[in-house]
């Protein structure tokens, strides 16, 4: 049995989708972007007009289907240098951070994710004591933790809210995490769906960096994964990053190109169950990691073949596979056949390419 799967939030395998969407007609200095939960609404903030704009996507998270709703919301009454913004999980609250006042502002939307119903709550929270140039704001799932990225100190700061998504209950945790080793202008941050990965986009290197948190949403447990992805080929002034709900798509807004760019961040997997047969075949959807499961017991030899139809150039085999001369064979974009043998219960597999260019 062959079982295909996919995993999101894979920055190491990220690729540009050759899909972009211009926001120049709304703002010439776009600085942030957010989706609603369903991916059918996109929001872009711009510091030219200190305004957030609302767009509709007819296909969820597909930037190629985006169009402007002719709906916007000005925050100029509170902030003169809009940089980042985020919604609460239910879309009933909006939070804006800016480098003009070094402050986070809270708004209410009477209809979830509908900017036309937004109003200021007259609630704010200063982060100036931590950073004089805050550029982004995000929360954990229940709104009891808030995080600020600042370019004044090249760090991310953590705050607690005793009542979720209620900025009036916020306090600084005295917890911060420096990203200066990767980029000295951290303009955007996002978590994955469970808070074990943090992504930071930097405007100095035009790259996105990946970090792991051993305890979800706890910055004291963060460490750099030594994984990054350059977006310089699309734009040299990235200002914000966000991801789809499942992490298979990533989006970057650029202030020079005045556009949003779409990327794929999905890793494909293929699991081969050796208890179900000795002949397997699959067609990769992209870069794929192969797993071999349920080999026979030690002392029982088994041989099996794997047919790969299509481009096998980005196949990652298990480390337990030993190849001739210690190197996995060079793959081609044609149909290929691989053979494997194990006699020790799958501790070691001996593999070789048996044929290629099969028609």
PLM region spans:
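Residue-level detector of Asp-centered blade-edge/turn motifs that repeat once per structural unit
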Residues: 37-38, 89-90, 141-142, 191-194, ...
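Blade-level signature of beta-propeller repeat domains, shared across WD40, Kelch, NHL, RCC1
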Residues: 199, 239-266
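Short loop/turn segments immediately following the C-termini of beta-strands
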Residues: 47, 99, 151, 203, ...
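A short beta-strand motif characteristic of beta-propeller blades
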Residues: 17-24, 69-76, 121-128, 173-180, ...
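Exposed extracellular interaction/assembly regions and N-terminal maturation sites
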Residues: 267-318, 335-336, 341-359
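Short loop/turn segments immediately following beta-strands, especially the blade-tip
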Residues: 2-11, 56-65, 106-117, 160-169, ...
């Amino acid at each position: 049995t062959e079982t295909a799967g996919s995993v999101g939030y894979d920055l190491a395998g990220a690729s540009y989708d050759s899909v972009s969407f211009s926001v120049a007609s709304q703002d010439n200095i776009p600085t942030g972007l957010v989706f609603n939960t369903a991916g059918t609404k996109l929001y872009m903030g711009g510091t030219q007009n200190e305004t957030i704009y609302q767009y509709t996507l007819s296909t969820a998270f597909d930037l190629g289907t985006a169009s402007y709703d002719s709906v916007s919301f000005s925050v100029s009454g509170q902030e003169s240098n809009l940089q980042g913004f985020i919604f609460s999980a239910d879309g009933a609250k909006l939070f804006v951070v800016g480098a003009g006042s070094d402050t986070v502002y809270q708004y209410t939307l009477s209809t979830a994710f509908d900017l036309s119903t937004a109003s200021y709550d007259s609630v704010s929270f200063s982060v100036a004591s931590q950073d004089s140039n805050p550029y982004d704001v995000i929360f954990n799932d229940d709104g009891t933790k808030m995080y600020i990225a600042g370019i004044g100190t090249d760090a991310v700061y953590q705050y607690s809210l005793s009542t979720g998504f209620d900025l009036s209950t916020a306090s600084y945790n005295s917890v911060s995490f420096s990203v200066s080793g990767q980029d000295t202008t951290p303009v955007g941050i996002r978590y994955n769906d469970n808070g074990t990965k943090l992504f930071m986009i930097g405007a100095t290197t035009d790259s996105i960096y990946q970090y792991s948190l051993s305890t979800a949403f706890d910055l004291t447990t963060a460490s750099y994964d030594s994984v990054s992805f350059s977006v310089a080929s699309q734009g040299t002034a990235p200002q914000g990053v966000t991801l789809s709900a499942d992490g298979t798509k990533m989006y970057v807004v650029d202030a020079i190109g005045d556009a949003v760019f779409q990327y794929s961040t999905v890793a494909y997997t293929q699991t081969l169950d050796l208890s179900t047969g000795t002949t397997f075949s699959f067609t990769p959807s992209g870069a794929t990691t192969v797993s071999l499961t349920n080999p026979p017991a030690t002392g029982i030899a088994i041989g099996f073949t794997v047919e790969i139809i299509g481009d096998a150039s980005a196949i990652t085999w298990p480390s337990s596979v030993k190849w001739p001369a210690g190197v996995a064979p060079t793959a081609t974009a044609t149909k290929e056949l691989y053979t494997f043998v194990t006699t020790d219960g799958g501790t070691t597999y001996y593999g070789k390419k048996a044929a290629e260019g099969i028609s």
